[in-house]
């Protein structure tokens, strides 16, 4: 059998390809040791002044930890001292408020609910709600309020809801305080409680709550031994920007107090507070807003 030119070319091509593959495989096997040797040699010849292998192996991390404490420890006492100073700032304010307690209590005493020690119900309230309006007028002309209490014009109308304790011992201080704090009232100006726009005690005052027993204030320093036969929620007009919404919040707070502490709701005429009375209060708010709008025109 004769082999032609085409068959010879195919055979030669196969031999050449096999030789190339064998040479490549031989170079790869022989080049592994050389490559590793060259790498090790290149690392060993790195200059020492640039850090050498220390930059690669990681001792620099130990050096970095020594560089971290760059804070001046002498500054720490000053920071803590300034923090303590900020915490102590409200204390003088509280002290000044106590200093005004005598004058504030005198004002509230003139406009309180004239609660007597006797359990007779007619003695729990004054003859009319004019005392609340007069009290609101005096409070607006008293010493400047804190930042959270905005000075308001004299009240033309005052909506009053009183809560009378059914228990002879009256409302106990700790339980009363817990209840009104849950309703968002905060202790403030005139040593009474105020409900602000924010539950945290910020924004304008929506309504207030006073002690119905003379002198009409609350003593937080002796709240554990405090008790009262009645408290009164009152909202003055003009007052909050949205009086109807503020009145609804006041009704909810009074109902919560009466429900949880066994109290009875009364209006400003010493009568039981009914749904009709609440609706009448709302109509008074609407009429007041209408008159105010007419006067502006």
Curated annotation (Swiss-Prot):
One of its GO terms (cellular component) is cell division site. One of its GO terms (biological process) is FtsZ-dependent cytokinesis. Keywords: Cell cycle, Cell division, Cell inner membrane, Cell membrane, Membrane, Transmembrane, Transmembrane helix. Residues 83-92 have a biased composition (Basic and acidic residues). Residues 23-297 are cytoplasmic. Essential cell division protein that stabilizes the FtsZ protofilaments by cross-linking them and that serves as a cytoplasmic membrane anchor for the Z ring. Also required for the recruitment to the septal ring of downstream cell division proteins. Interacts with FtsZ via their C-terminal domains. Belongs to the ZipA family. This is Cell division protein ZipA. It comes from Pseudomonas putida (strain ATCC 47054 / DSM 6125 / CFBP 8728 / NCIMB 11950 / KT2440).
């Amino acid at each position: 059998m004769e082999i032609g030119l085409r068959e010879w070319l195919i055979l030669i091509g196969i031999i050449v390809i096999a030789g190339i593959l064998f040479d490549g495989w031989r170079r790869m096997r022989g080049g592994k040791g050389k490559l590793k040797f060259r790498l090790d040699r290149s690392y060993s010849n790195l200059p020492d002044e640039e850090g050498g292998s220390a930059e690669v192996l990681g001792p620099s991390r130990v050096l970095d930890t020594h560089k971290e404490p760059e804070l001046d420890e002498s500054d720490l006492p000053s920071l803590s001292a300034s923090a303590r100073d900020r915490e102590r700032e409200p204390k003088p304010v509280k002290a000044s408020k106590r200093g005004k307690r005598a004058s504030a209590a005198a004002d509230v005493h003139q406009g309180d609910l004239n609660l007597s020690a006797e359990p007779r119900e007619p003695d729990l309230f004054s003859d009319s709600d004019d005392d609340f309006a007069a009290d609101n007028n005096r409070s607006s002309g008293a010493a400047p309020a804190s930042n959270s209490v905005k000075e308001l014009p004299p009240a033309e109308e005052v909506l009053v809801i009183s809560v009378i304790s059914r228990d002879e011992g009256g409302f106990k201080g700790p339980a009363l305080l817990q209840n009104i704090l849950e309703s968002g009232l905060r202790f403030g100006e005139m040593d009474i409680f105020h409900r602000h726009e924010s539950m945290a005690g910020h924004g304008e005052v929506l309504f207030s709550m006073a002690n119905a027993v003379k002198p009409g204030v609350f003593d937080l320093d002796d709240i554990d031994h405090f008790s009262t036969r009645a408290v009164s929620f009152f909202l003055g007009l003009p007052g909050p920007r949205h009086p109807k919404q503020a009145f609804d919040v006041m009704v909810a707070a009074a109902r919560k107090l009466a429900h949880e502490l066994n109290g009875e709701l009364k209006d400003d005429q010493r009568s039981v507070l009914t749904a009709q009375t609440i609706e009448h209060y709302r109509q008074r708010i609407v009429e007041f807003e209408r008159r105010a709008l007419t006067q502006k025109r």
